[in-house]
């Protein structure tokens, strides 16, 4: 099976194995604007997201803004943004990019710590299916596997699930080859 890894439980069910972790796509959250960036300075700006993690980080940075709940698939969330009085909505960059619908004026929210394993695809299979495990190893990206393993261990230690307002990012600093970690 193929999954968005951020939605996979940190402890896999008995009999299920992680067969491969694909190279991470863009892990950033992005802001899709309704109009211009002028709303950032407005005390009552309104942003939409369905994520408690995004809401908490947004309000920490912009405490006078309002955050409204936004649910549904990517296309329905974009449609809701277009049909409401919101100033923008926060999305996972990888989701929009995989669908080829990232707006050109979307803003990378590099300050926002993503969900653990955001932007990562995982392949799972039965733990006794050696043929599938061997075949999928060609897809496995070791660096991504290590980094998301750290992020998911952080999530597990905090006893959080995919809906908990927990952010985590592990990455390899290319100059030093050291793993850096940010968690919130």
List where the protein language model places each region.
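Small-molecule-sensing regulatory modules
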Residues: 55, 60-184
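N-terminal segment of the mature folded domain
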Residues: 1-13, 91, 96
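Generic low-polarity alpha-helical segments
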Residues: 1-2, 45, 123
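Residue-level signal for pocket-adjacent positions within structured domains
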Residues: 3, 11-13, 26, 69, ...
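A conserved helix-loop-strand patch within extracytoplasmic ligand-binding domains
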Residues: 5-64
């Amino acid at each position: 099976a193929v999954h968005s890894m951020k939605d996979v439980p940190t402890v896999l069910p008995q009999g299920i194995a992680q067969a491969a972790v694909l190279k991470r796509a863009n892990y950033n959250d992005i802001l899709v604007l309704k109009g211009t960036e002028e709303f950032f300075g407005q005390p009552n700006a309104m942003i939409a997201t369905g994520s408690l993690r995004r809401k908490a980080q947004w309000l920490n940075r912009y405490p006078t803004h309002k955050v409204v709940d936004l649910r549904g698939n990517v296309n329905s969330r974009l449609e809701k943004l277009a049909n409401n009085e919101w100033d923008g909505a926060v999305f996972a960059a990888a989701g929009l990019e995989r669908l080829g619908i990232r707006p050109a004026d979307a803003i990378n929210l590099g300050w926002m710590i993503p969900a653990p394993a955001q932007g990562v695809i995982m392949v799972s299979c039965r733990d006794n299916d050696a043929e599938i495990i061997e075949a999928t190893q060609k897809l496995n990206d070791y660096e991504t596997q290590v980094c998301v393993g750290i992020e998911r261990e952080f999530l597990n230690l905090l006893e959080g699930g995919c809906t908990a307002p927990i952010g985590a990012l592990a990455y390899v600093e290319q100059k030093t080859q050291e793993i850096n970690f940010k968690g919130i």
